[in-house]
Curated annotation (Swiss-Prot):
Residues 1-21 form the signal peptide. The RxLR-dEER motif acts to carry the protein into the host cell cytoplasm through binding to cell surface phosphatidylinositol-3-phosphate. This is Secreted RxLR effector protein PSE1. Secreted effector that impairs both plant effector-triggered immunity and pathogen-associated molecular patterns (PAMP)-triggered immunity (PTI). Suppresses plant cell death as a part of the plant defense responses. Facilitates plant infection by altering the auxin content at the roots penetration points of the of the pathogen. A motif (RxLR-dEER) lies at residues 53-73. Keywords: Secreted, Signal, Virulence. Transmembrane segments: none annotated. Induction: Specifically expressed during the first hours of infection of the host plant. Expression is induced during the appressorium-mediated penetration of host roots and peaks during the penetration process. Expression then declines during early biotrophy, and becomes barely detectable during the invasive growth of the oomycete along the stele, and later during the necrotrophic phase of the infection. Belongs to the RxLR effector family. Pfam families: RXLR. GO terms for cellular component: extracellular region; host cell. The lineage of its organism: Eukaryota, Sar, Stramenopiles, Oomycota, Peronosporales. It comes from the Eukaryota. It is found in: Secreted; Host cell.
């Protein structure tokens, strides 16, 4: 075959490919196919997994986690927190007032620690000293007692 024939055939192929009519007709768009193929699968999977999860949460009414446990025990009473914050300003972590020690022990029983304390009502700026004292006590003195 001559060089001119290769050029003509190549130009025709390039023209067909760039126009897109042959490509679109021959191959459907990949995104349409994958979206149609995956969507029903995701719905079925979500319905079965989500359904079990919803049933489990509805059966024990425990969606909120640590804050709900702490609130059920009455740990976050406003007047009590205000008094404890004032005590936190006056106490050191190595020599706690018994009320602060009891409060910190109640926080631990409610599965509150320095890394998840921001999920409780103690995340407000008013309780900064109380959070800092709890963090120091938890880090250095909790395990010793």
């Amino acid at each position: 075959m001559r060089l001119s024939s290769f050029i003509v055939v190549g130009a025709a192929v390039v023209n067909l490919l760039t126009s897109g009519s042959v490509v679109v007709a021959a191959f459907p768009r990949v995104s349409d196919v994958s979206a149609m193929a995956i969507a029903p699968h995701r719905m079925d999977q979500g319905a079965t997994n989500g359904g079990k999860r919803l049933l489990r949460y509805h059966s024990n009414n425990n969606r909120g986690g640590d804050e709900d446990i702490a609130e059920e025990r009455g740990i976050f009473d406003f007047k009590n927190l205000e008094m404890l914050t004032n005590l936190a300003r006056l106490n050191k972590a190595n020599n706690l007032d018994s009320r602060l020690d009891d409060f910190f022990q109640a926080l631990i029983k409610a599965k509150v620690n320095p890394t998840n304390i921001h999920h409780t009502r103690l995340d407000q700026d008013d309780y900064l000293e109380l959070r800092q004292l709890f963090r120091t006590w938890y880090t250095f003195y909790h395990r010793a007692s």
